[in-house]
Regions:
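A short acidic, helix-capping loop that chelates divalent metal ions and anchors anionic groups
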Residues: 61-65, 98-100, 150-154, 217-218, ...
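Active-site acidic/histidine proton-transfer and metal-coordination neighborhood
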Residues: 5-14, 19-20, 44, 97-208, ...
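Histidine-acidic metal/acid-base catalytic patches
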Residues: 5, 9-12, 20-29, 36-51, ...
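Conserved beta-strand positions in the central sheet of alpha/beta enzyme cores
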Residues: 54-56, 89-91, 143, 179, ...
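Alpha-helix-loop-beta-strand connector modules within alpha/beta enzyme cores
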Residues: 73-89, 161-174, 200-201, 264-265
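Active-site-proximal loop/turn and secondary-structure-junction residues that shape catalytic pockets
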Residues: 34-36, 59-61, 93-96, 146-150, ...
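Glycine-rich, proline-tolerant flexible connector loops at the mouths of alpha/beta enzymes
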Residues: 57-81, 147-152
């Protein structure tokens, strides 16, 4: 049901090379720059300390992934090989931009995010670069978004969907699937909105990067409510972070995995029972332990606990 990569024939992924032995139906991963911008150090921690065999690439050496030059790509490949890590996807900033002709989004940043600052007219280049990176790092997935959130996206929604469909077709011709992340600052923030988008954009090469943390931040109960609405055969990636509701406010802040409002054990159990076997990737965001590395270590402990409670980690 779910599209698999190089390890499709394996029912379980054994993760042994550097750390403890982990067995899971999922590709357990972490986004590298949630640990540190030092790519070698991030890979060492993921493999040796976390026992992972998979990693998600977003930025390194203080550069966004799509801005790496050939020398840096080669060096990243050498490091991945050293630590026997496979790449889940390219966490590209594709379509994280303003929609042309629409009112300026209040979410449109005034400075680069994760080292990315690309206009709408540059998105074709971002797509091409992302596909080339996917090929270079031997993955079949590229993360994308659906433009900075508008107060009223309805007049532009059909054109946005057409743009996504065209990009998915371009990617599909080269064996790549786009995984669109539900993101509070973009026009698809929740499971409910994701279900509508997937129904409107019918392409095997456009799937969902399901992010329960982002859905919670947008006011949805991601599991079971948001997840229940999703077409399970179009979930192509999953980000893992937690969110806690601020006291006396209808707002949320990031939390360590297991310390927020999301039923992650239930979510992992449902994914497993629904036949999902692709990535569950730690995207810490929370920095309550003082540093990115310390916070990610603490959040990884919470993620492991939830996976074990779900029967998705041995």
């Amino acid at each position: 049901m779910f599209r698999a990569g190089a390890f499709a024939s394996m029912a379980m992924y054994g993760m042994q090379a550097w750390g403890e032995i982990l067995k899971s139906p999922f590709r357990i991963a972490v986004i590298n720059d949630e640990i540190t911008q030092d790519f070698g150090r991030a890979c060492e921690i993921a493999a040796r300390d976390f026992g992972m065999q998979w990693i998600e690439l977003r930025g390194m050496w203080n550069k966004n992934i799509v801005n790496l030059d050939d020398k840096e790509i080669a060096e990243a490949g050498r490091i991945l090989k050293k630590y026997q890590l496979h790449v889940t996807d390219i966490a590209s900033p594709l379509f994280k931009c303003d929609w042309p002709g629409a009112p300026k989004s209040k979410f449109s940043p005034t400075s680069p995010q994760f080292g990315a600052d690309f206009t709408f007219d540059q998105q074709g280049d971002v797509l091409e670069r992302s596909i080339r990176l996917a090929k270079a790092f031997d993955t079949d997935r590229v993360r994308c978004f659906d433009f900075w959130r508008l107060d009223d996206a309805a007049p532009f929604r059909a054109a946005m969907n057409a743009k996504l469909l065209d990009a998915a077709k371009q990617a599909g011709k080269r064996g790549i699937t786009l995984v669109l992340e539900n993101e509070g600052a973009c026009n698809t923030a929740t499971g409910a909105e994701a279900a509508k988008l997937l129904a409107a954009v019918q392409s095997a090469n456009l799937m969902l990067n399901w992010d329960p943390g982002n859905a919670a931040g947008a006011g949805e109960k991601p599991y079971p409510d948001g997840y229940r609405l999703l077409p399970k055969d179009r979930i192509g990636h999953c980000h893992c972070k937690d969110a806690a509701k601020l006291p006396n406010a209808n707002k949320y802040e990031w939390a360590a995995m297991g310390k927020g409002v999301i039923d992650w054990a239930g979510q992992f159990r449902a994914l497993k029972n629904d036949g999902y076997h692709l990535a569950v990737s730690l995207e810490t965001h929370w920095r309550g332990a003082g540093t990115a590395e310390a916070s990610t270590r603490q959040s990884w402990a919470g993620m492991k606990d939830a996976l074990r409670k779900a029967g998705a980690l041995e």
